[in-house]
Regions:
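Structured catalytic/nucleic-acid-binding cores of DNA maintenance enzymes
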Residues: 1-121
């Protein structure tokens, strides 16, 4: 399980790479990872922009235009920024297509990670 320094490093790295990027589409390949209704999750994230990056304990909180995307890496979760031409593997469970032509890919070999959309009033 990533410790707090690793979680903070993930957060700062993502902030540097995707702040200001808009989500064009979301591909959920393992629906059990999503705490919300999957279709609602995908629709609500579409056209949202990554604005702020926060951490509460080991939870990553991505402030979007009108909601918060909360993510917990659990045991082995990792985020990658990749070109869409790079092949995915069976451990890539959520893929965010971004407006710069790149993809933010969430990979978790053990499938323990979780994502949830929160309203802004939760923070």
């Amino acid at each position: 399980m990533p410790e707090l320094p690793e979680v903070e490093t993930v957060l700062r790295t993502l902030e540097h790479q995707i702040q200001g990027r808009r989500i064009l589409d979301v591909d959920v390949r393992y629906p059990k990872m999503i705490e919300n209704d999957v279709e609602q999750f995908k629709q609500q994230l579409k056209n949202q922009t990554f604005n702020t990056f926060m951490r509460r304990g080991k939870y990553l909180l991505f402030g979007l235009d009108d909601c918060i995307l909360m993510s917990h890496l659990r045991m082995e979760g990792r985020y990658y920024i990749q070109d869409p031409t790079e092949p995915t593997n069976r451990h890539m469970h959520v893929i965010f297509r971004l407006d710069n032509g790149k993809e933010l890919r969430y990979m978790d070999t053990r499938k323990f990670g979780r994502m949830e959309i929160l309203s802004l009033i939760h923070i």
